[in-house]
Amino acid sequence: MRRSTEFGVKTAGGSMTTIFERIIEGAVECDKVFEDENFIVIKDKFPQAPVHLLIIPKKHIEKLQDMQSDDFSLLSEAGKIIQLMARDFGIENGYRVVINNGLEGGQSVFHLHIHLLGGGLLGSIA
């Protein structure tokens, strides 16, 4: 038996499958703009800017704080994808890159992901 939550599905055993894992598996439709062996990039369903993409590693890592030493190369790969997406979406002149880490950091889906926002003048956050 599965019980749905806002951001994933809880199995009878209590383990959580996030919405991102279900997207990666192809079980949930999304607006995918890029995919390779390690990442999928989708348009955010609730955009906070004219361009709002989510760069999601296929490897399940709950949050940035949980990364192991062999995971850090994913951040370098993500940087290259961010540059590519910025070019492809015409936001090279300015964009914001955000990782929300943990509940207090505003993370709502507990599968590491990077927000890429742009396409207009973004308000200050600091």
From Swiss-Prot:
The HIT domain covers 19-126
Motif range for Histidine triad motif? 111-115
Name the domain of life this protein comes from.
Answer: Bacteria
Molecular function (GO) terms listed?
catalytic activity
PANTHER family attached to this UniProt entry: HISTIDINE TRIAD HIT PROTEIN (PTHR23089)
Q: What is this protein called?
A: Uncharacterized HIT-like protein TC_0664
Q: Which organism is it from?
A: Chlamydia muridarum (strain MoPn / Nigg)
